[in-house]
Amino acid sequence: MPNLHPPIITTQQAKSYYSQILEVVPKEHSFKPLMTLFLTEQSDILDIAEGVKRGIVSAVKLYPAGSTTNSSNGVKDILHIYRLLEKLSHLDIPLLIHGEATDSEIDIFDREAVFIEKTLAPLRKSIPELRIVLEHITTQE
């Protein structure tokens, strides 16, 4: 998802990309892509909610800025989006997380564990009702 340039950040972009995907699916196949939006500090909760309501958007995806390929548009400070995350929780919209701390002083093999401790644990405590999927996690912590 962050490998798309530019990232899919609005419902309209997701709808367009959905159509592009279906254009290349052979007619004899039954395939329904589940579209997600790339979460930024400027994401519009009304657009997200409308996308979910219309069946276009299934979830939003959080990439910490600088955590992976093409994630520079990601969230720099999760505290800046807490209000949006609270609204996602109230609307029961899942948050998919690429859980990785981005501080260059943290060993690459410790970045998931540090993210869990410093970011995910406080988030879960602050917004316990928020549905979270921590994607491709490899740490035991």
Protein language model features and the residues they cover:
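Metal-cofactor-binding active-site regions of metalloenzymes
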Residues: M1-D47, G55-S72
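Histidine/acidic residue-rich metal-binding segments in metalloenzymes
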Residues: L46-L62, T68-E141
